[in-house]
Amino acid sequence: MSTEKAAWFPSLHQAGEAIALVDGELSLTYTELNDAVSHVVAGLLNGEASLKEERVAFLYPASFDYAALIIGVVAAGGIAVPLSVHASAGELSHCLSVAGVRRLLLPSEMRSEALDAVCESLGVGQLAVEDLPDAQVPHALPLAGEQGALIVFTSGTTGKPKGVVHTVASVSAMVTSLIE
């Protein structure tokens, strides 16, 4: 996976067997993270060249899947919409609606009748990472610095949460500063 537009994506495969993420006793190498991200990218694109800033939400606890999803959605040209696993069905409905989401990725244990009803009413499809189709990863990823990368919802202390869009360039700058 490579792109000329966001310098932090290529480092996933360049670091090889170095540890990328640690979760308690478990660790994930950059190679393993790159493989997981590639599965997300290929599955979401499913033969298309780009998600064209499609908003793709996910409802996963902090985990390796969460990391692969946030990177994979952006790498595929989409806008990642991470949602809180502690949000109520009503709060999730608001966020999904405001963000204009059409696909929600979540593990089976996060599904509920209330969330199923919300997704059905909004026309949002639900699937898990393992349900993404196996497909080829494109050689070049469709990224440009000015395109949307991430929608983060505010806390909503004075009203309903608002979605704040971050660009590929702003996310890249943040990640680069963390790496340095």
Pin down the residues of each PLM region.
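Conserved ATP-dependent adenylate/AMP-binding module captured primarily in the ANL superfamily
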Residues: V85-A114, M174-E180
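Conserved pre-ATP/AMP-binding loop-to-beta segment of ANL
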Residues: E17, Q136-F153, K160, V165
